[in-house]
Amino acid sequence: MALLQISEPGMSSAPHQHRLAVGIDLGTTNTLVATVRSGLAVVLDDEAGRSLLPSVVRYRPDGAIDVGYPAQAAQNVDPHNTIVSVKRFMGRGIADIDDIASLPYRFVDAPGMVQLKTAAGVKSPVEISAEILKLMRERAEASMGGELVGAVITVPAYFDDAQRQATKDAAQLAGLNVLRLLNEPTAAAIAYGLDNASEGVYAVYDLGGGTFDISILRLARGVFEVLATNGDSALGGDDFDQRVFCWMLEQGRFAPLSASDARLLLTKARDAKEALTEHSEVRVTAVLSTGEMMDATLTQRDFNAMTASLVAKTLAPTRKALRDAGLAADEVKGVVMVGGSTRMPCIRQAVADFFKQTPLTNLDPDKVVALGAAMQADVLAGNRGGDDWLLLDVIPLSLGLETMGGLTEKVIPRNTTIPTARAQDFTTFKDGQTAMSVHVLQGERELAANCRSLARFELRGIPPMVAGAARIRVTFQVDADGLLAVSAREQSTGVEASIQVKPSYGLADEDITRMLKDAFTHAKDDMYARALNEQIVEAQGLIAATRAALAEDGALLDDAEMAAIEAGIAGLEKLMAGPDHQAIKRGIEALNATTTGFAQRRMDRNVRRAMAGQKLETFD
């Protein structure tokens, strides 16, 4: 919904003026900016008529910054200061970068997000991305003749909180007002759905330079409902380049490469990959700074063989997304191809074989995301009615809390439509407990140790009560950008604590896919472990309550009764050290049975105390 500003009488400034808004596809390899003109979404070109801006930034020794084509031209001669594919570093730590040995950059191992040492000093991926976005803003304002009111920035559907927040920070650093972070497959669906007036179930297969997403959507009467999403936030065209790069090293048997030679071979590898989209073979030549040369022919067949495992890595998440949506491949009406990497013949053939239909490619896969983002920006800026279509996007992984015993309590299940808010009540574990630690988790496993930790905060000021009496309501809120906020409120006093979840860095390579795979693989073991931990927590509570009662009212028992209860406690503690949750359950039942008489005497004694000195009619 667009926000309206109310002006003084006579001071209204063009209430029906078209507001300038854009959609930006901040890609691993290329970045594009688009807008809506006369009702049609168009990609904005630079002065040379080029729509694609290479996502490359160079920091020169003289302090100047090159972005796009000038930077790309320098990547072989100045590899240390020319940053390529910076999107792969967004929201990630140095330990998360698998191919770090082959990269020419000087990484700084700082806490949180990785940083890079350049001629202009240490730079974060947020700062580097901001330079790209700044140039996009300048291109748009020059082309549209005014200042932008805002932009919709697209992100991979599998970007986590840290990666999304890093993208938003980069946009704000570039002077952009972020109207919305929009998932790339959803943006593509907008462009295709409105362009083709389509209805039915569609798959959006999005393979970019550094990320892969698969989304299953239902399009019906202007409603874009994401049924399921899956993918890999560190799989893309760059990985195909790496396979060709390794093949080149085998062909040339070179001495250890300098940074500039490594960048040269990577560039040649990308050129060869792109040439194979149109030809059955390509000649690959290179001359290194050492004078070493290579001259070899790469065939489409060899390329397909060396990259087959990467293609397969895209199909595994596709199967999971279909399973989550409760659909078979033959129930999908069409497959939308997004991202420049989908031009590879091996990708198109694999998708066609999997879905048993020819994928849709009538929109440029490089431009379709930016076009959809521009359409959404036009709505959010208030230039057209928001009832033309409705976006129902989802979160990729469940969100929840750690409870006693190291268990995971899911509050928002994965594939829940966003924006959303869910609340759940929790209580204290110990008598007199006045504080609670809230540990926010992301993942599908039953134990907290197997899920990703997002944030921790404490709620203090809980009034001291017996265990289980306090009521703490924990509320999870996920906004339309997919960003999470969590609050905890003690119901009787109103004391509250909250946190905006901003982890220090994002999910590691394939973490989300791995977390989902582990959840399926270990489901039975996890359920057993959960049952065991639940019984241990219950046993701990019973033992603590029994010992407190013995300390207070042990005089109500004779020696034999006291010994029986102590034996029951000891037996239960021994069972708690074992792996059998059913045995612990039986031990709990046995101790409860042993203490039944003791509990009855305590109750009778307390009733007598309450009635002492009272008249009978008081209790009528």
From Swiss-Prot:
The keyword ATP-binding applies. Keywords: ATP-binding, Chaperone, Nucleotide-binding. It comes from the Bacteria. Disulfide bonds: none annotated. SUPFAM superfamilies: Actin-like ATPase domain (SSF53067), Heat shock protein 70kD (HSP70), C-terminal subdomain (SSF100934), Heat shock protein 70kD (HSP70), peptide-binding domain (SSF100920). InterPro entries: ATPase_NBD, Heat_shock_70_CS, HscA_NBD, HSP70_C_sf, HSP70_peptide-bd_sf, Hsp_70_fam, ISC_FeS_clus_asmbl_HscA. One of its GO terms (molecular function) is ATP hydrolysis activity. GO terms for biological process: iron-sulfur cluster assembly. Chaperone involved in the maturation of iron-sulfur cluster-containing proteins. Has a low intrinsic ATPase activity which is markedly stimulated by HscB. Belongs to the heat shock protein 70 family. This is Chaperone protein HscA homolog. It comes from Thiobacillus denitrificans (strain ATCC 25259 / T1). The gene is hscA.
